[in-house]
From Swiss-Prot:
HAMAP family: PPV_L2. It comes from the Viruses. It comes from Human papillomavirus type 49. Disulfide bonds join C19-C25. Transmembrane segments: none annotated. It holds the Pfam family Late_protein_L2. One of its GO terms (molecular function) is structural molecule activity. This is Minor capsid protein L2. Interacts with major capsid protein L1. Interacts with E2; this interaction inhibits E2 transcriptional activity but not the DNA replication function E2. Interacts with host GADD45GIP1. Interacts with host HSPA8; this interaction is required for L2 nuclear translocation. Interacts with host importins KPNB2 and KPNB3. Forms a complex with importin alpha2-beta1 heterodimers via interaction with the importin alpha2 adapter. Interacts with host DYNLT1; this interaction is essential for virus intracellular transport during entry.
Length: 521
């Protein structure tokens, strides 16, 4: 059997062009040309939410569209014989609105009777408005003095040397003036430290400058040899040194402290007890058992308490029950920075037949409170002062007038050496005035003292004895009592009723009907 030859179908575009008019186009051709396939519908409805950006995804040929694929970095290809597309530039829209107002120079009105002939003038044309006329100014060059120079020539093959003499520098005149005023009332303490520009005594002046000076007058200072200290580099920064734990930080000591810390703070093998009693610091044995004080014995060593286990003894502190051994005090530092005093103790709770004791280890500790640093206050020296201290001299700062010479000349004439001096004005004379005093009567130290004031009253003179502290006030009194009028019960009670047209009334309590008990048969 001979197999039929399969012929190739025409292109979809040609088939659609011929069969569209007849109306017998295959459905695949219509969907492909009109882009109604499932893929086209997915892209059509999915493009509303997803943008693929010109990737060329579609049902057409993979030729990159009508223009083809363009490599990256190159322009579009140009076909020979084709009509190039012209790209027109965008036209900027013009703004709609009134035009700018341009000022126009005013023109003089023309006289109708004037002549129409324009006379000629010899002047040049006027400059247009808006232009700037520039006039060049020529300044003559300044006179430069000539300098005569000498040219030195040699027969050797070296280059020529031109010597130019420099201009002489005019001398500079310096004038230094000094003015001194003598003030006899101004004095300086001999203990004051002279600084730059400060004078000492009236006959001793120190003139110094920034780099040194030479004292004039007074005692010649003694020069001593000074040692120059090396200066600190500018980039060197001084940092605080951390506090040292010990003077000789050896590794063996560190290991011993670590082992002791593990033995003290082992939660599983050592019981932790915080002691608040202050006897734990000085006499811890009084917390274990009752004993007498021995001032000679120092409890800074390990203590062993021997007693019978069968004998039940209650210690002064319940935390130290069955303590058989108490170590010496150990000092450490807590994470909070407090000083902790610790003692490691062993309990003898159980004793075997062989004599061995069994008990737990207990770590007794107490934390010492902090000592707050007191604020430092500035103290002044008594009886002495340094050279930089400030002392106010009364005779120098204050103004005193000698009354012996100026204000009391008659005293000087009578007595050449008067006994009165200006310092006598400083004495405070107390003048006693008894105008507002009171008379006090009393006898003996233990007797009661009464103050008897006298008051002026319209009555006869009367003395009031004041036995209480305070002020006594006297004022006139009246003995006229007001007359009391009592009502008479014989008069009948008058009841006045007013005319009321509103329909309401007020019934007097006396007009109300009394309730009576009735007997029912």
């Amino acid at each position: 059997m001979v197999r039929a030859r399969r012929t190739k179908r025409d292109s979809v575009t040609n088939i659609y062009r011929t069969c569209k008019q007849a109306g017998n186009c295959p459905p695949d051709v219509v969907n492909k040309v009109e882009q109604t396939t499932i893929a086209d519908q997915i892209l059509k409805f999915g493009s509303t939410g997803v943008f693929f950006g010109g990737l060329g995804i579609g049902t057409g040929r993979g030729t990159g569209g009508s223009t083809g694929y363009v490599p990256i970095g190159e322009g579009p290809a140009i076909r020979v014989g084709g009509t190039p597309s012209v790209v027109r530039p965008g036209i900027l829209p013009e703004a709609i609105g009134p035009a700018d107002i341009i000022p126009i120079d005013t023109v003089n009105p023309i006289d109708p009777n004037a002549s129409s002939v324009v006379p000629l003038t010899d002047t040049g044309p006027d400059l247009l408005p808006g232009t700037i006329e520039t006039i060049a100014e020529v300044n003559p060059a300044p006179d430069i003095p000539r300098v005569d120079t000498s040219v030195v020539t040699t027969s050797r093959g070296s280059s020529a040397v031109l010597e130019v003499a420099s201009e002489p520098t005019p001398p500079t005149r310096t004038r230094i003036s000094r003015t001194q005023y003598h003030n006899p009332s101004f004095q300086i303490l001999t203990e004051s430290t002279p600084s730059l520009g400060e004078s000492a005594l009236t006959d001793h002046v120190v003139v110094t400058s920034g780099s040194g000076g030479q004292p004039i007058g007074g005692v010649t200072p003694v020069e001593i040899e000074l040692q120059e200290l090396p200066s600190r580099y500018t980039f060197e920064i001084e940092e605080p040194t951390p506090p040292r734990r010990s003077s000789t930080p050896l590794r063996n000591i560190t290991q011993a402290v670590g082992n002791l810390r593990r033995s003290l703070y082992n939660r599983r093998l050592t019981q932790q007890v915080n002691v608040q009693d202050p006897l734990f610091l000085q006499q811890p044995s009084r917390l274990v058992r009752f004993a007498f004080d021995n001032p000679v014995f120092e409890e800074e060593v390990t203590q062993i308490f021997e007693r019978d286990v069968a004998a039940v003894e209650e210690p002064p502190d319940r935390d130290f029950l069955d303590i058989a051994k108490l170590s010496r005090p150990l000092y450490s530092e807590t994470p909070q920075g407090y000083v902790r005093v610790s003692r490691l103790g062993n309990r003898a709770s159980i004793r075997t037949r062989s004599g061995a004791t069994v008990g737990a280890q207990v770590h007794f500790y107490t934390d010492l409170s902090t000592i707050d640093a007191e604020e430092s206050i500035e103290l002044s020296l008594l009886g002495e002062h340094s050279g930089d201290a400030t002392i106010v001299q009364g005779p120098v700062e204050s103004s005193f007038v000698d009354l012996n010479v100026q204000e009391l000349p008659q005293v000087i004439e009578v007595d050449p050496e008067p006994t009165f001096h200006s310092d006598d004005l400083l004495l405070d004379e107390q003048n006693e005035d008894f105008s507002g005093s009171q008379l006090v009567y009393g006898s003996g130290r233990r007797s009661t003292t009464f103050t008897v004031p006298r008051f002026s009253t319209p009555r006869s003179d009367t003395f009031y004895v004041q036995d209480l502290e305070g002020y006594a006030v006297s004022y006139p009194e009246r003995r006229n009592y007001p007359e009391i009028i009592y009502p008479q019960p014989d008069l009948p009670t008058v009841i006045i009723h007013t005319a009321d047209t509103s329909g309401d009334f007020y019934l007097h309590p006396s007009l109300r009907r009394r309730k009576r008990k009735r007997t029912y048969l």
